Amino acid sequence: MEDEEVAESWEEAADSGEIDRRLEKKLKITQKESRKSKSPPKVPIVIQDDSLPAGPPPQIRILKRPTSNGVVSGPNSASRPALPVKSLAQREAEYAEARKRILGSASPEEEQEKPILDRPTRISQPEDSRQPNNVIRQPLGPDGSQGFKQRR
């Protein structure tokens, strides 16, 4: 580039053919580089053709997870140990024991026999002192006016 002559304007460079020579030189260089870099594609491209029958679908296998000791359990073997069947009397005894441990009483009947004193009793009003249901109230506004019935 140092030995090349630089034209004063692009018009002089075009007239002398300098632009054409430079373009041809750059074009040759890029063509040589593209030839060198051309190599077979590294990944083969598979084009599917619908006319050919597809292969069989892939096999799907369901694997069983091994148990804690490393042995795969069969479909008929129970994963949990069988619980012994308890009689009604045994279940009621366990229930009473748990209830006594948690609530402090062994049977629910003890609780129902005691009157509940925690709740206040309802005081019934005599029928005469109650207000009749047919009373129509007129609401008053904050300033003592007739409220909603006031006309403007």
From Swiss-Prot:
The modification N-acetylmethionine is found at residue 1. Residues 30-86, 99-152 are annotated as: Disordered. The keyword Metal-binding does not apply. Residues 66-79 have a biased composition (Polar residues). InterPro entries: SUZ, SUZ-C, SZRD1. Residues 113-130 have a biased composition (Basic and acidic residues). This is SUZ RNA-binding domain-containing. It comes from Bos taurus.
